C-alpha cells in the first residue's frame, strides 16, 4: 500500500527524506518493476531541463515519464534562450506558463533548486536530476533499490564508497541515506579528494584493508570536468587504477556475495577493470534498469501531490 502521506510538491535532496520515505519509494519502484500500471487522472506534461551532459539520467527520466503516460517536451539548453541570458527561474516559469506539470532539472550550481522551490509564485513540480557536486537523489534511490533487492535489509551492511569523494554528488547522497537506513558506511580514495563533511556518515580508510570486509563496493567516477586545471594536469589514469581502481587482483579478494556498483558513466580501466563491468557480481546495468522504476516512483509522488494520479 502506497503511503499517501508521503506525497510532496518537489523532490530535490536526500536531506528531505527519512528512512521511511526512502523505503516507501523503493516499494513503489518495485511495484512498477513487477508490472503495476500507472493511472493518470488528467493529461500530465514533463520537461527535462539539463544544463549538464547526461545519458542515463535524462533518458531514464524520459522513459519513466513515457511509462507513466506523461507527455514529454523537448528541451536543449544549447539552443534555448538560456544562451541569450534567460535566467533559470524565467525558464522554469515559462514551462509552468505553457502548462508543464513537472520539470526535471540538472544544473552545475549546487542547490540551484532553492531559488525555485522557495519562490511562492512557482507551482510547477521540481525534481532534481543532479546539482553540481551537491545531491543526486534519484541516483541515490535507485542505488538503494538495487542494494535492497540484493540483501533485503540495510542494517549492518558494510558499504564502501570509493573514489572522487569531494566532487561526487552520488557520494554525498548515498552516504547520507545509507547512514539513515542503518548501513555501515566506509570511504576510500585519494586524500586530496576526501570531503571531511562525510565523516558524519562513516569512516575513511585504506581501500585494500577495507575491501575484503565489504558487502557493497560503490565505485565513483573520477569527475574530470570538476577538477581544477592543476589537478586535471596531474591526474594519471593508470596510476589511479593501480591505487584506487577495482583491479582483477582486488576483485578476487572481495567477500563472497559482495556486489559491485557504479553510477556510470564508467571510465573503464580507471575506476574498474573493463572485464569486471559485466562480471557476475556487478550490478551496474541492473542499477540502470532500476533507475527507470525509481524515477517512475519519484514522479508519481509529485503527480499525486498535483492530483494527477
UniProtKB/Swiss-Prot annotation:
Enzyme class, UniProt record, top EC level: transferase
Pfam families: OTCace, OTCace_N
GO CC term (a single one): cytosol
Keyword Transferase: yes
GO terms, molecular function: amino acid binding; aspartate carbamoyltransferase activity
Entry binding sites for L-aspartate: 84, 169, 221
Residue numbers binding carbamoyl phosphate: 56-57, 106, 136, 139, 264-265
Keywords assigned by UniProt, alphabetized: Pyrimidine biosynthesis, Transferase
Pathways involved: Pyrimidine metabolism; UMP biosynthesis via de novo pathway; (S)-dihydroorotate from bicarbonate: step 2/3
Single Gene Ontology BP annotation: 'de novo' UMP biosynthetic process
EC number of this enzyme: 2.1.3.2
Catalytic activity: carbamoyl phosphate + L-aspartate = N-carbamoyl-L-aspartate + phosphate + H(+)
Record PROSITE patterns: CARBAMOYLTRANSFERASE (PS00097)
Quaternary structure note: Heterododecamer (2C3:3R2) of six catalytic PyrB chains organized as two trimers (C3), and six regulatory PyrI chains organized as three dimers (R2).
Role noted for this protein: Catalyzes the condensation of carbamoyl phosphate and aspartate to form carbamoyl aspartate and inorganic phosphate, the committed step in the de novo pyrimidine nucleotide biosynthesis pathway.
Protein family (similarity comment): Belongs to the aspartate/ornithine carbamoyltransferase superfamily. ATCase family.
Protein name in UniProt: Aspartate carbamoyltransferase catalytic subunit
